[in-house]
Amino acid sequence: FIRLREGLTRINVKVKASDEETEINGRGPIIADDELQALYAQLDALTEQDTLILAGSIPSSLPSDMYEIIMKRLANKHIRIAVDATKDLLTRVLPYKPFLIKPNNHELSEIFGRTLSTKDDLVTAAKKLQSQGAQHVLISMAGDGAILVSADGTVYTSPAPKGTLINS
């Protein structure tokens, strides 16, 4: 972990009232240059035995292409990198061949600029992202389960766990 001098971990609150859900997303911390250098030092220590997860939005004090910067920095280290991010954050890392990306079905629709409502639509979109560099694509669909398109093109589906969905 890297202790930051200013700010806290970003806090996100979801408020659910009947069938409507509202998101309140906190700003996140301010990351100073020396703290960023400490992150780079930790990243540089990773080996091919490690897996790195890049998830969520980037703090406003960092460059908007931070995920690309990290992936470029690690490109020759053969580290498995998984990315769970939205639209441009996700699509801009594809040339660096992430091991796994995890868009949800709504994010996929946003990336492709059209509603993707069937399993075939989602699998086709996942394969398009693979052609752009992603190795494995895991599509989450909240209460409808998930679809994994593996690097060899095999499609796996899983229902959502049984239970009462509180929020997504």
List the predicted regions and their residue ranges:
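Conserved beta-alpha-beta core of the PfkB/ribokinase-like small-molecule kinase fold
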Residues: 51-122
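Conserved N-terminal subdomain of the carbohydrate kinase-like
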Residues: 1-51
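Short, charged, surface-exposed secondary-structure boundary motifs
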Residues: 34, 110-116, 165-168
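Short hydrophobic/aromatic-enriched beta-strand-loop microsegments
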Residues: 1-3, 99-109, 156-162
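Conserved phosphate-binding/catalytic region of the ribokinase-like
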Residues: 72-73, 119-168
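Short, acidic/turn-prone active-site loops that include or flank metal/cofactor-
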Residues: 27-30, 87, 105-108, 161-165
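Short loop/turn segments that connect beta-strands within the blades of beta-propeller domains
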Residues: 17-18, 86, 142, 151
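Structural motif
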Residues: 1, 11-12, 21-23, 50-51, ...
